[in-house]
Structures are given as structure tokens and as C-alpha cells.
């Protein structure tokens, strides 16, 4: 009894510290309103040849920086609560975002995400320089594959879903196969972002005009760039060609049950969606606050009369229009979220 009475004041003090410390730390947590996520940058963040990040850093005045362990580049931010991060490409993107979101200095539970980058655009749906708000993300990596040249003559391509016998049948996904194969973004939030930006004037260039004139057999591919609703087909391989585009179209229809259209192809969105959904189950982020905006820097398949090989290695004609579109279309959404933060912190926007 004597020992208990002697140590009881110390125990009480320790208990008070233990309860007070989380509250004190909570007051110091970093709470971004919006995180703009680019996947790569060329050289420096400012003042040189631009990648996906540079226009955001320069135009949103992301002049402050913070080093986060596990990230290749510092996080940039401004006083308005807009943060910018470069995730890296391919599977590295998901790993770096996990590192960011698990950093104990951040509270990202109310943060909105704008995944914002260039992509290969499907000429059946849009032209270079166009911007597509994704409703769905499709994983194009997990598959059986043989060289198409070795495939049976009646196969459209040499890729099929795990558990399948051929690519034409609807697959019965085995229990052991990784899941999910697609992610659906918050449809109300996507509709709001699209309604806010659908009439944004996009940059066109003489080079892009000349290039898309080759796509005269594609009405949407030969039109000036515009803002659309179109989904994100992601795989770590940089593929190109009409056969591969058909595969992307078919898999998008398959894994969205006919609701999706493969508008933009990229190498990161499936990894990012996978990471963010897992982080959401941990209470670190809110997946209902995630937006994906992809802009066409190049076509995903050649025009009539050109080989896929020649088209693949041709110089991008839509790079600068795509980088410009990423900011022109994304910025109004970021600004609206920040301006009405008193409302949007508690509830997501509606059209």
C-alpha cells in the first residue's frame, strides 16, 4: 500500500501527459486541403523544361517545401493549403504515396486529391491536348499473356484474364487472383468537377493540329482538344497500337460491366488507386475525395496508314498542350475547393 501511495502522483502525472500529448500533436498536424499529385518532373521544379509538376509549382506559388522520407522529391505547398507531390511513375507511384500518407506529421482525412498527369489518348474518343475526368480506373497489369504472333488466329490479342482459357470469354476470376481489377471514383464529385470545367478553353498548337489531321478517320481524334468524361486504363508497360487499344477497350468494358470507356492510358493510376483505397481502410485518407484528370500528350494508336512501331517512336506533338490542359482544367477545381473550404471540408461538392 505504501508503494502505491508513493507512486500514485507520478502515475497520475504520466497519465495526464499521455492523454495530453495526442491532443497537442493533433494541433500541430499538417492538414492539406488539396494535394495535386503529378507523376514526374523534368529537371528542376521551376524555370526549365516542364514536366507534370512545374506549371503547378509556378502558377500556384508552391514556394515552400517539406522533405518526406520515402519520397524522391520534396512536397511543395503554399499558404492556402494547396500541396503538390511527385509520386514517381509505374509501381513506384503507389509506394511513394503510401510513404506520404503514413507520415505521422500529416492528417489527410479531409484532404482532396487531384491525380493530374499526361496520358496516351484513345483517338476514338478524343485528341491530343484533351482532358478527361475519370470515373473508373482499370488495372491492365494482372493477366495471362502470350506473344500475339503465337496466339490462335481467332484471338484478338494474346492477353486474357487470370482463370480464362481464351480472351474472348467472360472470365470467372479465381479466388486466388488479385482484386479488385477496377476502382470507381465518387460519381458525384467527378460530375461536379466535370460540370465546373467542361467549357474550359484548351491550348491548341500548329504541331498538334498538323498531327491530328492524320487521324481523319477518327472524328473525335481529329477534332480540337476538349474536356470529357473518360476512364483511366493503367498498366506499367508503355504499350501502343490498334490491337492493344482494342484490348484496353475490351478490358475496360469487362471490368466496369460496360460502364467505362478507355479514354486515357497511363502507367500509375492503378497503383495509386490501390494505395489510396488501402489507406482509406486505415483511416488515413478518404477515397471519396479522389479525382483523376488525365490529358492526352500522344495518341495510343497510329493513324490509318502508319505502323504502330513508327507511331510509337514519333515525337510527341501534344506534350505542351497536355501539360497546359492539366493545369487549366485542374486549377478551377483546386481553387473552388479552397475557396469554399468551410463547406467542402465537411461534405464533398455536388453538381
Segments (PLM) and residue ranges:
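Sec/Tat signal peptide C-region and signal peptidase I cleavage site
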Residues: 21-26
Amino acid at each position: 500500500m505504501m508503494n502505491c501511495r508513493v507512486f500514485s502522483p507520478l502515475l497520475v502525472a504520466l497519465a495526464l501527459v499521455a492523454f495530453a500529448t495526442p491532443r497537442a500533436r493533433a494541433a500541430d498536424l499538417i492538414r492539406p486541403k488539396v494535394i495535386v499529385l503529378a507523376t514526374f518532373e523534368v529537371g528542376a521544379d521551376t524555370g526549365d523544361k516542364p514536366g507534370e509538376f512545374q506549371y503547378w509549382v509556378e502558377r500556384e506559388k508552391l514556394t515552400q517545401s517539406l522533405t518526406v522520407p520515402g519520397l524522391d522529391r520534396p512536397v511543395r505547398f503554399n499558404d492556402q493549403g494547396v500541396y503538390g507531390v511527385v509520386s514517381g511513375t509505374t509501381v513506384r507511384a503507389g509506394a511513394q504515396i503510401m510513404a506520404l500518407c503514413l507520415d505521422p506529421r500529416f492528417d489527410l482525412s479531409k484532404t482532396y486529391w487531384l491525380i493530374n498527369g499526361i496520358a496516351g489518348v484513345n483517338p476514338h474518343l478524343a485528341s491530343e491536348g484533351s482532358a478527361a475526368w475519370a470515373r473508373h480506373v482499370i488495372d491492365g497489369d494482372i493477366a495471362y499473356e502470350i506473344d500475339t504472333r503465337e496466339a490462335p488466329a481467332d484471338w484478338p490479342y494474346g492477353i486474357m484474364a487470370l482463370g480464362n482459357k481464351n480472351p474472348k470469354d467472360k472470365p470467372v476470376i479465381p479466388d486466388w487472383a488479385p482484386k479488385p481489377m477496377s476502382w470507381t471514383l465518387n460519381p458525384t464529385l467527378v460530375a461536379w468537377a466535370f460540370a465546373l470545367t467542361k467549357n474550359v478553353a484548351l491550348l491548341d498548337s500548329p504541331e498538334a493540329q498538323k498531327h491530328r489531321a492524320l487521324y481523319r478517320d477518327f472524328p473525335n481524334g481529329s477534332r480540337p482538344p476538349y474536356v470529357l468524361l473518360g476512364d483511366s486504363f493503367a498498366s506499367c508497360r508503355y504499350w501502343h497500337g490498334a490491337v492493344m487499344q482494342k484490348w484496353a477497350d475490351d478490358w475496360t468494358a469487362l471490368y466496369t460491366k460496360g460502364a467505362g470507356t478507355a479514354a486515357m492510358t497511363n502507367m500509375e493510376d492503378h497503383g495509386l488507386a490501390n494505395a489510396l483505397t488501402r489507406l482509406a481502410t486505415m483511416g488515413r485518407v478518404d477515397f471519396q475525395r479522389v479525382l483523376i484528370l488525365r490529358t492526352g500528350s500522344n495518341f495510343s494508336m497510329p493513324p490509318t496508314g502508319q505502323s504502330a512501331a513508327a507511331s510509337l517512336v514519333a515525337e510527341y506533338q501534344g506534350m505542351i498542350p497536355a501539360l497546359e490542359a492539366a493545369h487549366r482544367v485542374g486549377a478551377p477545381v483546386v481553387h473552388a475547393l479552397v475557396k469554399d473550404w468551410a463547406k467542402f471540408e465537411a461534405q464533398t461538392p455536388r453538381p
